[in-house]
UniProtKB/Swiss-Prot annotation:
Residues 84-99, 107-120, 258-275 have a biased composition (Low complexity). Female specific, expressed in both somatic and germline cells but highly enriched in ovaries. In the germarium of the developing oocyte expressed in germline stem cells, cystoblasts and developing germline cysts. Expressed in nurse cells in the germarium and egg chamber. One of its GO terms (cellular component) is chromatin. Residues 152-167 have a biased composition (Polar residues). GO terms for molecular function: chromatin binding; methylated histone binding. This is Chromo domain-containing protein rhino. The keyword Transmembrane does not apply.
Length: 418
């Protein structure tokens, strides 16, 4: 085949001749930027106005490295000039009108460092003088406050004692401050024990102060014998509480009763009931029935007067009931609420008194149903002459009635799921 009839190569494009290619000359580099981390330069083309300037990647201007270096040197010179102006403005001396840094040599850097150190030293000295003047002024104004603080105090102020006129404690007359103090009997008694205040001439305050120190409070325990039916932990807490209250009432003041309304809501016990309760503790140990009777009589006074002494029969009944009640309460307290189980009566299959199954001695009539439990197979069968249905093990009847068993299993239908 000739060359004219060859297939053209679609992948190749014929380039125009080199004679018609225009060459563009770079006149100057005007700017620099970064796009996606890659540097680009603003190129001014010779023979074209500034509107035709283009951004070219730095790789495309490799033959213009002299112009790129000239642009970088110009940028460095401008940055250096701006830094020199900023340093000149920060100086306080008026003589420094122009920038001092002209060369980047070692001698110029030493001079600038020495000058900056001298300026910093002058500034720190001026600030220290200003601080000293301020401190002197503060000391002059604080002299009066020191005199007030050093004034001797005649009485320890507190929030519970000082009234609305308590700001006069630090005045020149210490005697006037003591008259403006509100004296509560409890605080006064505490201060009198510690000798913090002088005894006052008011009769009302002296009467309300405590004359005798309060007695120590303790719970009264019942003496027990070896044959006592119950321990001290089974004693009702109401009786111990009511016996300890007379001791508490003897230690309280009239001022304590007037301080809060919550103290009035507490149960009070009369002198007669307290004497009776103390007599009970001094006598012989009581049984649980007598203790219950005494607590009930103390709760209702008129009901106790109408009732007589407890009989022996009643005490015995109370004791018998209390043992069962205590045992139930203790069992309920031991296990938490979530773990408590309901108690059901024991269920047992009734014992067979009559013959059952093969023991009937009758012939097999029909096999009705079968069920398997674990590895055992049971058959529901009826006997001839008996209407009841019995469940027997297959091993008991497979030797005597094999044909009927086979006939039953053949009659079953096998259901295949769809």
């Amino acid at each position: 085949m000739s060359r004219n009839h060859q297939r053209p190569n679609l992948g190749l494009v014929d380039a125009p001749p080199n004679d018609h290619v225009e060459e563009y000359v770079v006149e100057k580099i005007l700017g620099k930027r970064f796009v996606n981390g890659r540097p680009q330069v603003l190129v001014k083309w010779s023979g074209f106005p500034n509107e035709n300037n283009t951004w070219e990647p730095l790789e495309n201007v490799g033959n213009c490295m002299k112009l790129v270096s000239d642009f970088e040197s110009e940028v460095f010179r401008l940055h250096r000039k701006a830094a020199a102006k900023s340093v000149g403005k920060s100086k306080s001396s008026p003589s420094s009108s122009g920038p001092l840094i002209t060369e980047n040599g070692p001698s110029s850097s030493k001079k600038t460092q020495q000058h900056s150190k001298s300026v910093q030293a002058k500034n720190t000295a001026g600030m220290s003088k200003m601080n000293q003047k301020k401190g002197k002024n503060i000391k002059k104004t604080a002299g009066k406050i020191k005199d007030i603080e050093n004034y001797p105090k005649t009485q320890m102020p507190s929030t519970s004692q000082v009234s609305t006129d308590s700001t006069e404690v630090f005045d020149g007359n210490p005697s006037a401050t003591t008259t403006n103090m509100i004296k509560s009997p409890r605080i006064q008694s505490l201060f009198s024990d510690l000798n913090l205040i002088e005894p006052t001439k008011d009769k009302d305050v002296g009467d309300t102060s405590l004359k005798t120190p309060p007695k120590s409070r303790r719970l009264i325990e019942f003496p027990q014998r070896e044959d006592a039916p119950l321990s001290s932990k089974h004693v009702s807490p109401m009786l111990i509480r009511k016996e300890s209250q007379p001791l508490q009432s003897s230690c309280t003041d009239d001022s304590d009763l007037g301080e809060s309304s919550s103290s009035m809501s507490l149960p009070t016990v009369s002198s007669t009931s307290s004497e009776k309760s103390i007599k009970v503790t001094k006598s012989e140990p009581k049984t649980l029935g007598q203790i219950k009777f005494s607590s009930r009589s103390s709760d209702g006074g008129h009901a106790a007067s109408s009732l007589g002494a407890p009989k022996e029969g009643d005490i015995g009944l109370d004791l018998s009931g209390s043992d069962s009640m205590d045992s139930e309460v203790e069992s309920m307290r031991r296990c938490p609420r979530r773990k408590r189980k309901k108690t059901y009566p024991d269920w047992k299959f009734p014992e067979m008194t009559k013959p059952f199954g093969v023991n009937r001695g009758l012939d097999l009539d029909k096999i009705l149903h079968c069920y398997q439990m674990n590895d055992d197979l049971f058959m529901f069968v009826t006997w001839k002459g008996c209407s009841s249905i019995d469940a027997v093990h297959i091993n008991d009847i497979k030797e005597a009635y094999p044909l009927q068993i086979i006939k039953y299993f053949e009659s079953l239908r096998i259901i295949v799921p769809k």
